[in-house]
Amino acid sequence: RWVPEVYDRLPSEGALILCDSIADAVTGAEWIQESTPERLEIKQVALAEIQESCVVEAIVASSTSGFMPSELQAGSARPEQLLVAHPYNPVYLLPIVEVVPSAVVPEETVQRAESLLTDIGMKPITLRAEIPAHVGDRLLEAVWREALWLIKDGVATTEQIDDLMTHGFGLRWAQKGLFETYRTAGGEAGMKHFLEQFGPCLQWPWTKLTDVPDLDDALIDRIVEQSDAQAAGRSVSELEEERDANLVAMLKALRQEDTAAGAFLNRLGRPLTNLAKHQE
């Protein structure tokens, strides 16, 4: 119900069709999105079954958050048809999607994938090389790992860490990202000055880097207890409703300023109507 508040123009509503088999679902489809559980053997079986029934021209994309396309393509009859298109939840409000082809995927297929994604209101970011966990989840993993250490070492609570993000740098990141935030911090001299001034800090032992805390029962219990207290009795559905309302408000504000995700959404009124050409 939030989507109409974000997009100016939407195509006419379609119909959700439930199928009894993968073959029925993919026959004649132009785009097929695989979203099975994050286990390589399950995905490979599903992808093989998809390719048995889909047309050769179809794009078969995986939502995998961790596997590289070359891993998914192992044993595939048509590996050049498979790529990764990794979105972020809630998919209906966050426009970004990581497109990850392997070396065997033709450039024409990549360009067609980018075009189709743009036509449905997504912002495709095509990575220059495949890597486990792509880009977004690697950044999130680094922050998550450090947060677990801060809780394990008794430095901060889950609520304090979330407050630091929601009341601080998270607000900057939502509109400027990481590098442009630091470029601004460098003053009129820009990024070069920032790197010269703060670059040496990278040598300081501030973080745990790649060390992973042991998620033993004690740490799990501590996180769960603090998170439950932070939720204050609100259900997951209530938290999701609050999240979506906040995202819509933020996207509207970014649209008004014509920046970041808002600038992208401002250009989407016309492209979204292009869905009709894919439904002919």
Task: Place the predicted regions along the sequence by residue.
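NAD(P)-dependent Rossmann-like dehydrogenase/reductase catalytic/cofactor-binding core
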Residues: 122, 126, 153-280
